């Protein structure tokens, strides 16, 4: 799997308000774990560890 900032179908990150929200989001997508992380310029967003390949991770390009 891959570590990274989990993204929705529009290449946008998920805003993180609580670590348990991100952890649940990541494990629901079959990742190992998740937590809040500060990422300039996006702010506090969800970081996931060991996501399976088909789950989108924030890539280069704009959030649509």
From Swiss-Prot:
One Pfam assignment: Toxin_3
Coiled coil regions, renumbered to chain: none
Gene Ontology BP annotations: defense response
Keywords from the named record: Disulfide bond, Ion channel impairing toxin, Neurotoxin, Secreted, Toxin, Voltage-gated sodium channel impairing toxin
A single GO cellular-component term on record: extracellular region
Record's subcellular location: Secreted
Superkingdom classification of source: Eukaryota
Disulfide bonds: 12-63, 16-36, 22-46, 26-48
Domain LCN-type CS-alpha/beta residues, every copy: 2-64
CDD domains: neurotoxins_LC_scorpion
SUPFAM superfamilies, sorted: Scorpion toxin-like
Tissue specificity field: Expressed by the venom gland.
Family, per entry: Belongs to the long (4 C-C) scorpion toxin superfamily. Sodium channel inhibitor family. Alpha subfamily.
Protein name: Neurotoxin BTN
Lineage, opening ranks: Eukaryota, Metazoa, Ecdysozoa, Arthropoda, Chelicerata
């Amino acid at each position: 799997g891959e570590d990274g900032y989990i993204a929705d179908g529009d290449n946008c990150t998920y805003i993180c308000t609580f670590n348990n929200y991100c952890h649940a989001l990541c494990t629901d997508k079959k990742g190992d774990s998740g937590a809040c992380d500060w990422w300039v310029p996006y702010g506090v967003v969800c970081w996931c560890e060991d996501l399976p390949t088909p789950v989108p991770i924030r890539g280069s390009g704009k959030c649509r």
